[in-house]
């Protein structure tokens, strides 16, 4: 809403953004400079764990951003990567997860395990979203 965008999905390869009354199909196609990896972060001062992950994936820079909007800007191709330690609940991620994954993003834990829902306490494990396997192209 802050940027006058609405995101929605209704299944694999069917994620969309409505902006300025125009519907755009999302496919995670990179819209930033090739050869560089741009990440979103939940904080302006990421933890040492997250900084290590950003370094491991050769992230060029990161931008702090709140809410599941982070998932959506990866689906648009405006950013390439997001990593988060254990901190949120399933309902905090579910809608953004659906939009990003159905646009082609790869979503897992930081340990590259499948991200699961339906846990007894609803607490999320760590999270990693990659625009695709080749982040800088």
Each PLM stretch: what is its role?
Residues 1-71, 124-137:
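Acidic beta-strand-loop-alpha-helix segment within the catalytic core
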């Amino acid at each position: 809403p802050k940027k006058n965008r609405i995101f929605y999905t209704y299944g694999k390869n069917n994620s969309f953004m409505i902006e300025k009354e125009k519907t755009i199909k999302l496919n995670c196609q990179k819209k930033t400079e090739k050869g560089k990896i741009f990440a979103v972060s939940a904080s302006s001062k990421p933890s040492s764990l997250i900084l290590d992950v950003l370094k491991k994936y050769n992230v060029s820079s990161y931008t702090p951003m709140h809410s599941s909007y982070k998932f959506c800007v990866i689906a648009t191709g405006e950013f390439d990567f997001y990593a988060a330690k254990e901190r949120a609940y399933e309902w905090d991620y579910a809608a953004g997860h659906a939009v990003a994954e159905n646009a082609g993003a790869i979503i897992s834990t930081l340990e590259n395990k499948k991200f699961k829902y339906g846990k007894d306490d609803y607490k999320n494990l760590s999270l990693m979203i990659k625009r695709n396997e080749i982040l800088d192209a």
